[in-house]
C-alpha cells in the first residue's frame, strides 16, 4: 500500500511539471498559435488581457474567458 502513495506522488510531480509547458509568446506566430491577437498599442477589448508580446512593444492579447 505504501508503494501506491509513492507512485501517486511521482505521478502528480510529473503532471505538475507538464502543465507548465506553455510559454509566453515572443512573436506573432506564437501569439496566434496560443489563441491571441497582436494589438497595436494595448488590448482594446474590455475582456482581453496582454499575456506576451508579438514584437517589441506590441502586446499579444487574449480573451479572459478562454
Swiss-Prot record:
Induction: Induced in the theca layer of the F3 stage ovarian follicle by intravenous injection of LPS. Expression in the granulosa layer of the ovarian follicle is not affected by intravenous injection of LPS.
Keyword Methyltransferase: no
Pro-peptide region(s): 20-25
UniProt gene name: GAL8
Keywords: Antibiotic, Antimicrobial, Defensin, Disulfide bond, Secreted, Signal
Keyword Secreted set for record: yes
Functional description taken from the UniProt entry: Has bactericidal activity.
Organism of provenance: Gallus gallus (Chicken)
Signal peptide: 1-19
GO terms assigned for molecular function: CCR6 chemokine receptor binding; chemoattractant activity
Family, as annotated: Belongs to the beta-defensin family.
GO biological process, one term: cell chemotaxis
Lineage: Eukaryota, Metazoa, Chordata, Craniata, Vertebrata
Transmembrane domains' residue ranges: none
Paired cysteines (S-S): 31-60, 38-54, 43-61
Pfam family name, one: Defensin_beta
Any Gene Ontology CC annotation: extracellular space
Protein name, per record: Gallinacin-8
InterPro entries in the record: Defensin_beta-like
Tissue-level expression: Expressed in the liver, kidney, gall bladder, testis, ovary and male and femae reproductive tracts. Expressed in the ovarian stroma and the theca and granulosa layers of the ovarian follicle.
Localisation: Secreted; Cytoplasmic granule
Amino acid at each position: 500500500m505504501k508503494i501506491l502513495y509513492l507512485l501517486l506522488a511521482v505521478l502528480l510531480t510529473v503532471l505538475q511539471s507538464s502543465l507548465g509547458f506553455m510559454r509566453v509568446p515572443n512573436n506573432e506566430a506564437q501569439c496566434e498559435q496560443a489563441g491571441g491577437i497582436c494589438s497595436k498599442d494595448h488590448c482594446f477589448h474590455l475582456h482581453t488581457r496582454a499575456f506576451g508580446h508579438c514584437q517589441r512593444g506590441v502586446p499579444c492579447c487574449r480573451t479572459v474567458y478562454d
